[in-house]
Structures are given as structure tokens and as C-alpha cells.
Amino acid sequence: MACKHLPFLALAGVLLAYLCSQSEAASNFDCCLTYTKNVYHHARNFVGFTTQMADEACDINAIIFHLKSKRSVCADPKQIWVKRILHLLSLRTKKM
């Protein structure tokens, strides 16, 4: 009787191992954990941005600014300076 269930148990084990590896992969995202304390006044050093939403992978909402120096800056989307830089970047892309 046990031999009848062995293929099913083996398949269930493989499926469980696959699902566990997928959930680990989802947690490997680079998320902003804190916001920068610096205030940036000029958009000239920024080349773009990414929006991070708080969901299963990341804990906080953030704007990730990408700088010419290949660095990234995590900013609070509620801050006035962040909204101003986003506006300036959108104007820059409309001109292109």
C-alpha cells in the first residue's frame, strides 16, 4: 500500500521544494529600507527614477532616484523636494 503513494509523495516533495525556492527569490529584491536625510535642490545630477511600492517585497513606499554617478538615492515620496525633482524630471523627458 505504501508503494502506491510513493510517487505522489515524491512529486509533492519536489513541488514543495520548488515553491519554497520561489518565495525566497521574491525576497531578494533591493528595497529602500530608509529615506535619505539629504535634500537635493537640483535635478541636474539625476538621470531617472523608479517608484517602489510597499507590498510583499518592500516595506515602504519610496522614490529611487538614479544619479549620473550610478548611485541610487531613496527618497520619501511625500517630501516637497522629491515632488519638485519628479516634476523637473518629467519636464526634461517631455522636451526629448
From Swiss-Prot:
Pfam families: IL8
Role according to the record: Acts as a ligand for C-C chemokine receptor CCR6. Signals through binding and activation of CCR6 and induces a strong chemotactic response and mobilization of intracellular calcium ions. The ligand-receptor pair CCL20-CCR6 is responsible for the chemotaxis of dendritic cells (DC), effector/memory T-cells and B-cells and plays an important role at skin and mucosal surfaces under homeostatic and inflammatory conditions, as well as in pathology, including cancer and autoimmune diseases. CCL20 acts as a chemotactic factor that attracts lymphocytes and, slightly, neutrophils, but not monocytes.
GO cellular component: extracellular space
Tissue-specificity statement: Low levels in thymus and lung.
Keyword Signal: yes
Designated name of the protein: C-C motif chemokine 20
Location (main, coarse): secreted
GO biological process entries: calcium-mediated signaling; cell chemotaxis; cellular response to lipopolysaccharide; cellular response to lipoteichoic acid; chemotaxis; immune response; inflammatory response; positive regulation of interleukin-1 alpha production
Induction section of the entry: By TNF in experimental allergic panencaphalomyelitis (EAP) and by TNF and IL-1 in primary astrocytes.
